[in-house]
Design a protein with these regions (language model features):
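Sec-dependent signal peptide recognition
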Residues: 1-8
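C-terminal/domain-edge helix-coil "capping" segments
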Residues: 15-49, 147, 154, 167-277
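Charged, amphipathic alpha-helical segments
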Residues: 144-161
Length: 277
């Protein structure tokens, strides 16, 4: 039995060497994107890009992280406006106009005008400053829901102090995007999408006496938590795709090629329907 325990210890030690431990010296990379990003950049091209404004895309959930030491940490990222703007740009269907930092932009333009009024001042913006562009469509919405532990589960077994277990947890983040006609205030279309955030843990261990006064204790575990910002970005990417597809179906905008509606990505999202619980 003693030799069997030592053999088990060697096996578990060998497994521990195969665990993919992140390298703390890794260089910064571009933000990771989900599978919906591939669909976003594979859409048919538009007949003409649409000028849109995004004033605010905020967290409307009021949810905080459940950890006792994180009472002031929100459950979802607070940079929703930046993520939505990125998705609109990546789709190549829209020209987002700066509105979140509008006050900063207006202040900078005042500085330019003040410099232009002085004859002896050198201006790098010429003698005239063009007007700001206006949007045809306003994109409204926000992060409307964050549900924790919508699914949980696990399995485990232990015999004579030796065994293993695994468990998982699923959360869900939901976003809403609305396209609003600037001239009339009419809501042209509205889309709500959800993305599941999966976390799981696998562990194994042994705790038993292998001989008189000789105790064997071994623990091995691995956890994986899907980053919330990537899940949120995927939900926003999907919402933008649905917004484009619904707009084409309703005649709000058109693809450059009429045959674009036969695009596999277009047909995939056009055929999606709301799930009925």
């Amino acid at each position: 039995m003693k030799y069997s325990m030592l053999l088990l210890l060697l096996i578990i030690s060998g497994c521990s060497n195969s665990i993919d431990v992140p390298d703390t010296s890794e260089l910064p990379t571009l933000m990771q994107r989900g599978a919906s990003y591939v669909d976003l950049i594979s859409l048919p091209k538009p007949q003409g890009k649409i000028y849109v404004s995004v004033y605010d895309f905020r967290d409307q959930t009021g949810q905080y992280k459940p950890q006792p030491n994180s009472n002031f940490s929100t459950a979802v990222p607070q940079g929703g406006t930046a993520l939505l703007t990125m998705a609109l740009l990546d789709s190549e269907w829209f020209f987002p106009l700066e509105r979140q930092g509008l006050q900063n932009l207006l202040t900078e333009r005042k500085i330019i005008r003040a410099a232009q009024k002085k004859q002896d001042s050198i201006s790098n913006h010429g003698s005239t400053l063009p007007s700001l562009l206006s949007a045809n469509v306003m994109i409204e919405g926000g992060i409307v829901a964050y549900d924790s532990n919508i699914k949980t589960g696990g399995v485990g077994a232990r015999y004579l102090g030796i065994g293993g277990s695994g468990q998982y947890r699923a959360d869900q983040v939901t976003v809403n995007i609305r396209a609003v006609d600037v001239r009339s205030g009419k809501i042209l279309t509205s889309v709500t999408t959800s993305k599941t955030i999966l976390s799981y843990e696998v562990s194994a261990g042994a705790f038993r006496f292998v001989d008189y006064k000789e105790l064997l204790e071994v623990e091995l575990g691995y956890t994986n938590n899907e980053p919330v910002n990537i899940a949120l970005m995927s939900a926003i990417d999907s919402a933008v795709i649905h917004l484009i597809v619904k707009g084409i179906e309703d005649g709000l905008w058109r693809p450059a090629n009429p045959a674009g509606t036969e695009n596999p990505i277009f047909r995939k999202y056009a055929s999606e329907t709301n799930q009925i619980l």
